[in-house]
């Protein structure tokens, strides 16, 4: 016996299917399901009178033959597609994406459910890969709580706490600090990796930081990003297969942007603040977006350009870079970095895929819990101001959604040599997954999984008779407790450090994972974000021209994903 359901009734029961569209939060962005891996009439769902019961949707197979957890009927939004599927998790990793059920009685089953299988209901939810923030100033450990609650599951950067150096630069300097920070990483339910200080003109001080566990090196103008330091740092990175991140010379003291590009010598580098106000060669750091060896990112304070952006930045910059507003030279330095024209161009360069990544710059001119929000606010603003992308159509914004989700998931992972473990929803990868109700997409996740275990979720009063009574807020779950913490999160280190046995020497509890393939990455590897325009910036008007076109847009006066979500 069959029963024909309306699309609405089907979506309410099993979630949207092929051809259905979903609005992302209160934005103008619509995604459309491209494929449904489930089979109509054979869907699995847990609950009283539902399918996943013994002899029905649940098989008799033993634990070795079934996943530890399945997420049923979820909409997956990732760089590779927008699909409806069941997701299987086994031993902390994504085991399969397909059709779950009982293969003994159901057709087309690719994921067998057994008595050893836990179920997370994904009906009506969107699942994304955990976010990766590659621009972290480790100023306070409480940032990790904020980041995790926002959907970020990997944090890369540097620092030692609220030291003056860390307040301004993302460096964990020297072997002693590196060891202490790696030991501290054991206490937090998030994947972590640390950058050493790259500003020195001879190799050994850099090599010893890589050997101590750094995943890469950070060049920052506040430590002196000279051509000699750049050249030396990249040479060490080439020898150790680690990445270099750079914040270039705002004052153009050691040379102009052309001097910095020349010092790269065609070698791969992640350019932080390839943007309109974050820092770097004034006013034309945006030029580096056209270089094949440059992997460009920007940070979230200027995302997107609004009527309040300029006013906010001056005081923020004075504090972060230890400047004195009573000193004329310090004030001039700050004002040189805040340019409405280049901030506006940054919006468009993100939309066209010239800027490949987006990160926070946490507590140092950036908000650690707003990477995902501001990414999608930028996408919305560009949809409203510029219309559909050529790759999209009147029905959906699928390509734009894939482009923007890649900016904080797969592209940072590729850049820093961790894409073999995290950054996308693909079999074999660590099960760092974020579940969203569509109305709250990008703003407030329903649940965050780390290594296949629930790490944080919206949870009601623990003394209530059911999980939902107020006050409902984010609470840490069992993946953050006891020995489970060290088995559901990763610490990234260099291959040199892993080979040297730092895990045993430092007494680390978390699994350590070496970064790899950092030096052969090019802009062409930045998924959906590989455009290399020829850019010029007028030194007087700051107008930005890319491939002959003036890049300009109006500041937003109102944004989605904002106050209506934060009334309480």
From Swiss-Prot:
Lineage, uppermost ranks: Bacteria, Pseudomonadati, Pseudomonadota, Betaproteobacteria, Burkholderiales
Positions carrying N6-carboxylysine: 218
Q: Which NCBIfam families match?
A: PRK13206.1, PRK13207.1, urease_alph
| A Pfam family reported for this protein in Swiss-Prot or TrEMBL | Urease_alpha
Q: Which organism is it from?
A: Burkholderia vietnamiensis (strain G4 / LMG 22486)
Name of this protein: Urease subunit alpha
Q: Which keywords does this chain's UniProt record carry?
A: Cytoplasm, Hydrolase, Metal-binding, Nickel
Which GO MF term does the entry hold, naming one? urease activity
Q: Assembly and interactions?
A: Heterotrimer of UreA (gamma), UreB (beta) and UreC (alpha) subunits. Three heterotrimers associate to form the active enzyme.
* Principal cellular location given in the protein's record: cytoplasm
Membrane-spanning regions, if any?
none
Query: What is any one GO biological process for this UniProt entry?
Result: urea catabolic process
